[in-house]
């Protein structure tokens, strides 16, 4: 069971007192409060009040309670530090009786962005593969719920930059876009007003395309080497990508997996009589070679 801290206890005690004050019989006419309906977060303002003499003023907000003695002049001054958290507030004034009124504090102008880009790596030319999501906050880190324009600027390693503008929905803006045709670093920047945040996604080569192997025999051994392995956009597959060489001869079927090094894959196989040799990379199959003792 979670223990209640001293600060939490004091807050609960104050709220209980306020609740009790609000239900006390109003045997005398209390001063009237007339706060504005909405206030921008962090903006000082005044509440017109009708009454005379002295009273106790309470301001109950989403994350704190303010209490102070006031003189019932023409208006009550509310400090900017008292209304930094967005949400509903209750103003309570107690002299011979208690009266209350509510008002709403709304987020100020956009001042911070929380920006997420997914994934960190993506194959080139893949539809709807990049997700960008931005959360818009004001300077007090209230989520700005009113619609705000957010520009997502995409700058690929090669090719022209482009952008998309969307409006936030309850503080959130997002897009889904295709990866570009060329491998390399792609920067995505979210911009709202004078605020911007940038993230990077690394585009890598897609599946192999036009995979071909050539063979050089030497006795009962054959050396197999691929042409430079690239995807359909001409991007080289990264070193370490596995290429599979398969041989079928009188001794049976065998497969050797070899990583790409410096753009090509290379291996040696022993051959017994007639043989059929093929190459594949992932789900992509390349050419086949019929080996009859000479190629």
Predicted features along the sequence, with ranges:
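The feature marks long extracellular or luminal low-complexity segments
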Residues: 2-9, 27-295
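Short alpha-helical segments used as structural interaction elements across diverse proteins
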Residues: 10-11, 23
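Sec-dependent signal peptide recognition
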Residues: 12-18
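Hydrophobic h-region of N-terminal signal peptides that target proteins for export
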Residues: 19-28
